[in-house]
Amino acid sequence: MIGILGAGAFGTALAVTLGREQPVTLWARGGTPRLAVDLPEQVQLTADFGEALAGTVLLAVPMQALGGLLRAEAARLQGRALVACCKGVDLATGLGPTGLIAEACPGSPAAILTGPSFAADIARGLPTALTLATQDEAAGEALQRQLSTAALRLYRTTDTVGAELGGALKNVIAIAAGVVIGAGLGQSARAALMTRGYAEMQRLALALGARPETLAGLSGLGDLVLTCTSDQSRNFRYGQALGAGAAFDGSVTVEGRATARAVVDLAVRHGIDMPIAAMVDALVEGRVTLPQAIQSLLSRPLKQE
């Protein structure tokens, strides 16, 4: 059996696709999933945390809530295969999801499920390919078999650093891409932004030990393309609202907002130039206006690509 902690859009979508083929217990804190879909018969919905603690547990909670959950429930989670289903960098520690798992539950295989996907597509059974990253190769093979379905295809890697950073950094670039479209700057500007943003992703990830092929795969480039080109992306929609000077629903989780600050801190610590990420952070925090952010990026010194 599989347990899923968190009944937000992604956790519910995973419950639906996995529950078509095997028993799943979905923990919803309030007892109601966020995604309005019919759950398969093999999916048990519960508000009891303990009922969702299977041998394999998917952690489908917001990135900034993951560390607190792991620390609070470490004793009950210890020894189970733990798969993070969120993207970002923890503001308190600077760790990614698998780092938080390893710190709180050192006896558990730590993995992350990431890549280009929208919850609605997964729930509808549309073909989707994701990356499953874990440094435990035996656990990775077992999880790959257990979590793959007829419509959900998983590719395995041991490069947790690359997989985590690809998923985290693309959210920051997606906000910037949304700003470009929201401000009416055009498709050419978005293409340039995505390309230069990808270069920033590579610089930081490689400096932190990621493999280049991971950044060029599903969890990096694949996720970047999807998130920067669709208004199904919450990060992209948030950026659009920023660019247009419009209000945005404050109840919607936008992982890239917090990630931008953490990414800038990492970049400074490692001496990596990330002007787009820095401008996103400054814009989100209100330290610069949109015209100032645009002017700052366009007035940078000319250089070789």
UniProtKB/Swiss-Prot annotation:
One of its GO terms (cellular component) is cytosol. Sn-glycerol 3-phosphate binds at K87, G115, S117, K170, D223, S233, R234, N235. GO terms for molecular function: glycerol-3-phosphate dehydrogenase [NAD(P)+] activity; NAD binding. NADPH binds at F10, R29, K87, A119, R234, E255. SUPFAM superfamilies: 6-phosphogluconate dehydrogenase C-terminal domain-like, NAD(P)-binding Rossmann-fold domains. InterPro entries: 6-PGluconate_DH-like_C_sf (IPR008927), 6PGD_dom2 (IPR013328), G3P_DH_NAD-dep (IPR006168), G3P_DH_NAD-dep_C (IPR006109), G3P_DH_NAD-dep_N (IPR011128), NAD(P)-bd_dom_sf (IPR036291). Its main location: cytoplasm. Pathway: Membrane lipid metabolism; glycerophospholipid metabolism. It holds the Pfam family NAD_Gly3P_dh_C. Its EC number is 1.1.1.94. The active site is at K170 (proton acceptor). It catalyses: sn-glycerol 3-phosphate + NAD(+) = dihydroxyacetone phosphate + NADH + H(+); sn-glycerol 3-phosphate + NADP(+) = dihydroxyacetone phosphate + NADPH + H(+). It is found in: Cytoplasm. GO terms for biological process: carbohydrate metabolic process; glycerol-3-phosphate biosynthetic process; glycerol-3-phosphate catabolic process; glycerophospholipid metabolic process; phospholipid biosynthetic process. Keywords: Cytoplasm, Lipid biosynthesis, Lipid metabolism, NAD, NADP, Nucleotide-binding, Oxidoreductase, Phospholipid biosynthesis, Phospholipid metabolism. Catalyzes the reduction of the glycolytic intermediate dihydroxyacetone phosphate (DHAP) to sn-glycerol 3-phosphate (G3P), the key precursor for phospholipid synthesis. Belongs to the NAD-dependent glycerol-3-phosphate dehydrogenase family. NCBIfam families: PRK00094.1-2, PRK00094.1-4. This is Glycerol-3-phosphate dehydrogenase [NAD(P)+]. The gene is gpsA.
